[in-house]
Amino acid sequence: MTSDHEQAQYRPCVGLMVLNRQGLVWIGRRADAPNEPEGRGSWWQMPQGGIDLEEDPRAAALRELTEETGLRTVEVVAEHPKWLNYDLPSNLIGKAWGGRWRGQRQKWFLIRFLGDDSEVTLTPPPGHQMEFDAWRWAPLDQLPALVIPFKRSVYDDVIATFAPLVRPLGS
């Protein structure tokens, strides 16, 4: 016999590793949001978000990037060849996202930011919640230690896949 949460589906999402010209990765500190399953204000992560019904993952990635960070001056460098899943901890299954999802199924993209840091805004568009309350550029090897533990295996896979492409622009 399986429990309800074992039968729950994964929320379709995208994730974005955004590089600046120096080869550093954009990370945001999770904003303190009520009922937020992914960590309140103490964890950092790369941008990610849901894919709308019938939306193409690449289009969703660019939309989510703009909604969460304000970044528009970008180019897509690569797409992860696989969909990656993570499960929520058992204490959050049935509570997070209205109890509808057991975790997320993510398609990751490597994005190069070609603009100026002044383009970043953490103020969300109308009707959206603030995702991050701070941001910075970080070296790739720092990411696993900064992310909430239940996402680390996904981050390890994303880093291993994209690391050969992470370098300063022009090198």
Task: Outline where the language-model segments fall.
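N-terminal strand-loop-strand
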Residues: 2-46
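A periodicity- and composition-biased signal for non-globular, repetitive helical segments
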Residues: 17, 35-36, 54, 113, ...
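Short amphipathic alpha-helical segments enriched in hydrophobics
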Residues: 26-29, 69, 166
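Charged phosphate-binding loop/patch that engages nucleotide di/tri-phosphates or the phosphate backbone
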Residues: 140-171
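Hydrophobic (often cysteine-bearing) scaffold residues that line and stabilize catalytic clefts
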Residues: 10, 57, 151, 155
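Functional cleft and adjacent loop/helix regions within the main domain
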Residues: 43, 92-98, 128, 163, ...
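Unchanged
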Residues: 50-149
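Short, glycine/charged-enriched secondary-structure capping and boundary segments
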Residues: 32-33, 41, 91-92, 125, ...
